Amino acid sequence: MKASKIREMTNQELHNELKKLKNELFNLRFQLATNQLENPMRIREVKRTIARIKTILRERELEQEKANKNAK
């Protein structure tokens, strides 16, 4: 998933997507351990998407803190 598409999502949607991706990563790792994984690149893609989502959530959190600090 591209960062530009992730940025269009709301925080609630991002949290839901993050939960879904973490569950998918768990299942992919389980498949890898049992030698049933067809596409090992999917693990990398999911991990990177999780990182992108966490980064964007953190950016928004910092923007919120900065706005609150400037408002005082």
UniProtKB/Swiss-Prot annotation:
Keyword tags: Ribonucleoprotein, Ribosomal protein
Record keyword ATP-binding present: no
UniProt cross-references to CDD domains, sorted A to Z: Ribosomal_L29_HIP
Any one GO molecular function term: structural constituent of ribosome
InterPro entries: Ribosomal_protein_uL29, Ribosomal_uL29, Ribosomal_uL29_CS, Ribosomal_uL29_sf
Pfam families tied to this protein: Ribosomal_L29
Keyword DNA-binding: no
Classification via PROSITE patterns: RIBOSOMAL_L29 (PS00579)
PANTHER family: 60S RIBOSOMAL PROTEIN L35/50S RIBOSOMAL PROTEIN L29 (PTHR10916), LARGE RIBOSOMAL SUBUNIT PROTEIN UL29C (PTHR10916:SF0)
Family statement drawn from the similarity comment of this UniProt entry: Belongs to the universal ribosomal protein uL29 family.
Record protein name field: Large ribosomal subunit protein uL29
Gene it is expressed from: rpmC
